[in-house]
Every structure is written in structure tokens, then in C-alpha cells.
Amino acid sequence: MYYRRQGEPQEMYGNGNNSVSSSAVNTYQPYYKEDFNILDPALSDSQRYIIYAIVAAILLLLFWLLYKKYGHKIGRKGSVSMFY
């Protein structure tokens, strides 16, 4: 079971009501791991895999562009010449 402090949601939005009246009673209330999901839990598996594929494609494109820009610095010739 996971717990969070009771005052957290109100303090996040800053409603200006920072009373300590309920702090003594029931300081912790249960919450669930699903609260921390990045993706919507209502998504089906196929939609989830589509999102994963898009994220993977973006990461691969980013690494490819970085390798195109800086790849000559970590090329084989530069690293081999150290040892010979």
C-alpha cells in the first residue's frame, strides 16, 4: 500500500487555505501506483505500442543525427590510433 500526505493536492494548486486542522487526523491517505502513469491507463495495448514505436523512432532519429554530427570523433581510426 502506498501513502501520500493528505494536504498535498490542495497545496499543489495553492488555494491559500493552509489550515492544519486535518493534519492530526488521518495524515496519510492511500494512493495507487496508477497515479504515476505517464500514459493514460484507458489506452488499449495497440495504442500503447503505437506510442512506444513513435518514441523509439524519435530516439533512433536523435541518435542517428548525433552520430552523423559527432560520429567522426568516435570513429575507429581515432580510437585505434591510441593503442598503436
Curated annotation (Swiss-Prot):
<keyword id="KW-0472">Membrane</keyword>
<protein>
    <recommendedName>
        <fullName>Uncharacterized protein 141R</fullName>
    </recommendedName>
</protein>
<feature type="region of interest" description="Disordered">
    <location>
        <begin position="1"/>
        <end position="21"/>
    </location>
</feature>
<keyword id="KW-1133">Transmembrane helix</keyword>
<dbReference type="GO" id="GO:0016020">
    <property type="term" value="C:membrane"/>
</dbReference>
<feature type="transmembrane region" description="Helical">
    <location>
        <begin position="49"/>
        <end position="69"/>
    </location>
</feature>
<keyword id="KW-0812">Transmembrane</keyword>
